A protein has these predicted regions:
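Conserved nucleotide- and phosphate/pyrophosphate-binding catalytic cores
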Residues: 207-434
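NTP-dependent nucleotidyl-transfer catalytic core
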Residues: 1-197, 201-205, 212-223
Length: 434
């Protein structure tokens, strides 16, 4: 399947420039495309993943991808999608952010072989440009009349409180120069980006055309390919939760939390996300959706999505661990979880510390202990929950006549330090014994 056709059936294609000439260009040989990444953070989120994935589809189609790190433009700040001036980052912070982001690309792209991906940093050429050089050789090709029509600029100009600085106003010129530089030095003819970057892409193509004045008419100048905004069906941003962003690296979002995020995607988005985010082929996805339609409660689409995404960024071993943890949590044996997974699974539940020396004494009885947690408010309420069989220790219900007299002991400790208490099906508390 051709590259653009692959993007179309997956719903990843928003706009292109170049028309039929672009298609001819792509099928007539191996080409080079780039996508830029803004180093505002030291890691990438799910929202940053789509362009990386598109670069991988580009690579699988027999073309070469370039990952452009914005070490130069990151010192300026992209005004696109921002209603206020960005806080300028230091050179040291930008360099640190780039180093952190680089961890993600090798999870998706192949950096070896005939179509090996390469990484470049636009600081290598932008920081070498003199101010007068930019004004004379680049700035003269940009019409301010056109630049102020760009949505990100227009919105800021209409905001009397914020406005837009000359620094951010110049971002479009620098991004266009990136495309020109890669066209000159690496024969890169395609820029891939989100739909909000369309205006910047067109500016870069126009700069290339002006630079190539006098070149043969049939020589391809450049083109852009954009993907749609990464949003859920309700319009919300993907990868944002009440507890924060979902990151692509284990130090920011654990494999279990990552897996759970995809498992909890609503039905109306799950099929679309399978196409957008995984590399499963069309027949496989259609078979999964058919299975889901026949038994929606089994959530086949979400399970396939969670497993596929977790395998990409955390490996097949963590997929298995996450599924085992889910089984243990919902009816299995919590004691079977290793210490790392136990910490991941219960990282977000309420927790408190207690004296290990009190285990086996009246102070560690459930009637005394439960009111000190967020599971109940009083000893009376604790007794009611115990009598009703609503309380579980490490996933095992405490029931029968002896429930009220139950006392936690060292035998209940998981990995020597933790006892998990649950009221009902979902209210958990992690007691740490020190």
């Amino acid at each position: 399947m051709q590259f653009l056709d692959e993007l179309k059936w997956r719903g990843l294609l928003h706009q292109t420039t170049g028309g039929d000439e672009l298609q001819k260009h792509l099928v007539s040989g191996s080409r080079i495309a780039y996508c830029g990444f803004d180093p505002t953070k030291d890691a990438l989120t799910i929202g940053n993943y789509m362009p990386i994935k598109i670069l991988r589809h580009w690579q699988l189609a027999g073309h070469k991808p370039i990952v452009l790190m914005g070490g130069g433009t990151g010192l300026i700040g992209d005004p696109s999608g921002k209603d206020a001036e960005r806080q300028l980052l230091s050179k040291e912070q930008v360099a640190k952010n780039i180093e952190g982001q680089l961890r993600c690309f090798s999870k998706v792209l192949d950096f070896e072989g005939e179509h090996a991906a390469i990484i470049v940093n636009n600081a290598d050429w932008l920081c070498e440009l003199g101010f007068l050089d930019v004004l004379r050789d680049v700035g003269k090709y940009f019409s301010v009349n056109t630049m102020i029509q760009k949505d990100s600029v227009k919105d800021r100009l209409n905001n009397r409180e914020q406005g837009i600085s000359y620094t951010e106003f110049s971002y479009m010129i620098l991004q266009a120069y990136d495309f020109l530089h890669l066209r000159r030095k690496m024969d890169c003819t395609i820029q891939i980006a989100g739909s909000y970057q369309y205006g910047n892409i067109v500016a870069g193509i126009d700069l290339i055309r002006r630079d190539m004045t006098g070149s043969p008419e049939d020589q391809f100048r450049g083109a852009g390919i954009t993907n749609p905004l990464v949003t859920a069906s309700d319009g919300s941003k993907i990868g944002k939760t009440e507890k924060g962003a979902i990151w692509l690296t284990e130090d920011r979002t654990s494999p279990y939390a990552f897996h759970q995020y995809w498992l909890n995607i609503p039905d109306e988005d799950a099929g679309k996300f399978l196409r957008w985010f995984t590399f499963l082929d069309q027949p496989t996805i259609e078979a999964i959706e058919k299975e889901h339609a026949e038994s929606p409660h089994q959530r086949a689409t979400q399970k396939a999505l969670a497993d596929a995404m977790t395998e990409i960024f955390h490996g097949s071993e963590n997929v298995e661990r996450c599924n085992d943890a889910a089984k243990a949590l919902f009816g299995g044996d919590i004691k079977s979880l290793d210490e790392t997974m136990l910490s991941e699974v219960f990282a977000e539940v309420p927790a408190g510390e207690f004296a290990k020396s009190s285990l086996g004494t009246e102070a560690a009885s459930l009637v005394e202990l439960l009111p000190q947690t967020e599971l109940c408010k009083s000893k009376r309420e604790a007794r009611e929950f115990l009598q009703n069989g609503s309380v579980a220790i490490n996933g095992k219900k405490v029931a029968g006549d002896t429930a009220i007299a139950c006392v936690l002991t060292s035998d209940d400790l998981l990995h020597g330090s933790t006892i998990l208490l649950r009221r009902g099906k979902k209210a958990w508390f992690a007691s740490r014994w020190v």
